[in-house]
Amino acid sequence: TEPVGTMIVDIGGGTTEVAILSLGNIVFAHSVRVGGDKIDEAIIAYMRRTHNLLIGEASAERIKKNIGVARKPEKSTGIKIEVRGRDLVNGVPKEITITEAQVAEAISDPVRQIVDGVKMALEQAPPELAADIVEKGIVMTGGGALLRDIDGVLRDATGLPLSLIHISEPTRHDR
């Protein structure tokens, strides 16, 4: 059997795992300490830094899931969402509106780190497996892979096709 290379990118909560597999074995694996949690933290830090607004993890995750996007929309600021938190200047509750473009700016660093991890793994791929990856592309999975346009960002950065495999979390009924 001839070795066939496959690249898997699993963007989880705490880390992004990048692996190159062949014949059921891991040929190369790399872990980037960036995942959905770091994206949430970046949103929290952005809100604090640019709006003097303290928000919690649940609010950051809601922002990420509702209007999170891996890069700025081309033609406008995109969809808007209301965000509530505590004003860090006077300590009272405050509501502001933020846009997709602002969220993309907020999460640009963790997105870049994920892209860099994928590119580094591609550079380490054995040549014969790299040819397979060029042909088959990259398979993405994990909750972070659901971030809107992360596939487009990775496609543009690598020149490779991407496919998404979403494995839903088990429900109480499934257990």
Question: What is the predicted function of each stretch?
Answer:
Residues 8-15, 21-25, 35-37, 43, ...:
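A short acidic Gly-Thr/Ser loop motif
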Residues 7-8, 15-20, 54, 80-82, ...:
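Structured core elements
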Residues 165-175:
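Single conserved hydrophobic/aromatic residue that forms the stacking wall/gate
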Residues 150-164:
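Catalytic phosphate/nucleotide-handling subdomain of diverse soluble enzymes
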Residues 52, 119-136:
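Phosphate/pyrophosphate-binding loops at sites that engage ATP/ADP/AMP, CoA/4′-phosphopantetheine
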Residues 1-9:
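Conserved phosphate-binding catalytic cores of ATP/NTP-utilizing and phosphoryl-transfer enzymes
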Residues 130-154:
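Glycine-rich phosphate-binding loops at beta-strand->alpha-helix junctions
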Residues 23-108, 112, 133:
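Phosphate-binding glycine-rich/basic clefts of nucleotide- and phosphate-handling proteins
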